[in-house]
Amino acid sequence: NKTRAAMSVENYRFDIEAHDEVAHQAAVESMVLLKNDDAILPVAGDAKVTVIGEFARTPRYQGGGSSHITPTKMTSFLDALTERGVDAKFAPGFTLDLEPADPALEAEAVEAAKGADVVLMFLGLPEAAESEGFDRETLDMPAKQIALLEAVAAENKNVVVVLSNGSVVTVAPWAKNAKGILESWLLGQSGGPALADVLFGKVSPSGKLAQTIPFDINDDPSTINWPGEEGHVDYGEGVFVGYRYYDTYNKAVDYPFG
């Protein structure tokens, strides 16, 4: 069958570099700058930089379960810094699981933050916290990551948080510990270079929120419907799904849709 032959992997060719450039552009355009006090971003080219967070080395670049694909390329943020000749300290700070905090990793991260002009903290939701086949029970960030952020901010006030998450997390409970907050979502295979471009000022972040970020999970009307019964959930808010509820009832939010 000629059609099947034409569609086979063996006979299919594409430009890997051009493919990666499209992924890079999509990543750059999707990031949302939530906070930038004291113009901490972009990072100056001669700044002493410390990078904290396992996501910087092991990026969560896509969703889990049946959405998983094998990328043609994969460059972490740390790799992107190396390619650009940026000399930065790195400390993982935590493990990408739901296990309790590792005091040794926390202490290493706090020590690495000392004396830095800017600390880039890569925080977010590991795949164990959000993926296919189960529901999240909270909008909060993992407690061990928040504790680490507080410890680092107590040592160095020039903290920028880079979020890696597939869905909304509450920001208000910990925002005071960061001068800058960049929502980067799950950035795909070219997320590392895209983050380097945005954080160091080659590209200005211009993404807009496709979701509302509430102050608290209980501010969302859908909360009372969860978890439903026998696998079924009644959307009791009716037409007032998402931002429509907040707009209609003038409910204050942390960051609005759009």
Regions found by a protein language model. Name each.
Residues 3:
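Short, surface-exposed polybasic-aromatic patches that bind anionic ligands, especially phosphate groups
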Residues 7-17, 21-258:
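C-terminal non-catalytic regions of proteins with extracellular/luminal or membrane-system context
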